[in-house]
Amino acid sequence: MAIGLARMFGIVLPLNFYSPYKAASITEFWRRWHITLSHFLRDYVYISLGGNRRGKTRRFANLITTMLLGGLWHGAGWNFIIWGGLHGLYLILHQMWQALLSRLSLNTSGSAYSALAWLVTMLYVVVG
């Protein structure tokens, strides 16, 4: 509705959601969900903290910090902060999983793996 109203006044708004429920990983979900906020947090928090340039431990700490602040942005209650921390943890677990799959040279292109990956992602999003 906002996009249509803005276009009536000649304003083109940036894409903010890109089918996030089709994502087959939590990382992909966050690339598709609330894109403008995600880009802001990436550019002004994650990268300012050092991003992924200072080793794995620092990268994980930067992810958690960024997601905690994203949770705080959604609301100033502990439930929002915990939610942000959980999603930071999910992103870390996904990065660790990807590294393990890469080390083991496992093929993840099959439809069964894709379906399971989507299901796990939706459980993270809906339950956590």
What are these regions (language model features)?
Residues 1-128:
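Membrane-embedded transmembrane alpha-helical bundles that form the catalytic cores
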